[in-house]
Amino acid sequence: VADWPAVAAGRASDEAMADYLRGLDAGKPVAILHGEPEIGGRFFYTDDMSGLNFQRRNGPLGEALDRLLALKEHTAPSALAVQSTPTAAALPGFAQANPQPLLDASVGPRIWIGNAITTATHFDMNYNIACAVAGRRRFTLFPPDQLKTLYLGPLEFTPAGPPVSMVDIAAPDLERYPRFAEAWATAQVAELEPGDAIYIPYFWFHNVESLDPFTVLVNYWWSETPAVLSRPLEVLLHALASLRDLPPREREIWRGMFEHFVFQAHGDPVAHLPPERRGSLGEMTPEHLARIRAILLRALSQP
């Protein structure tokens, strides 16, 4: 994306980058994250995990840009970021002026603006292309099979959506998180300059560090096969509530059920049935989805 007008503005100066974004600003409120200097730019939990170490509020994009420019003069600045904001609403015209040739036009860009901040190691349930527009970004990636070594935090109470690793990769506590040494041996690190892009495959864990006082990144998320009813993470939450605390023998039975019907470990589990009699075990039609949705809603509404 080195030929983008936005990248040219970012290379010119931080002020030029801010002016470029102001010229596209639709004036709609955006989510602004703010953390005190003591957090060192790392948006995370409080020490006792009773809350988050930053505040989130809605405000004008121009206000965030002005504040970021002012914070450049501070030796110990607070952390400030505008994250995952769709440009279609906030910056109309950005996608047309800065086109991407690889993905369908329906995959719209999102913009991330901030100072020297860190987004804790997490996964996304999408494929991702991230493009550095202004400032440098360091991506540290871990493959999905390192789930067991990354010590994830809670699934439903998170800093920003997906669960995050509790390990601070800048200063890992190996006494508390000893298996992280295995994860670190698999890590891949890429440092992006303005105009560079990185492809992050589905579910690859990534820690993102912004390395300069004024940074802008644009990313594109997409799914190869969109979820037809809910996200897999919601299935996991339901399974935790209904399966995890069963007696061990019963859990093993349900492990076999999932392996057989969901992951099809032994081939097509309903090949012996006529296609029109396979129900939800066959092709997932709109009618089958509606029936499953009704069953789940009825079950979840029970006390």
Regions of interest found by a model, annotated:
Residues 1-197, 205-303:
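N-terminal accessory scaffold of Fe(II)-dependent oxygenases
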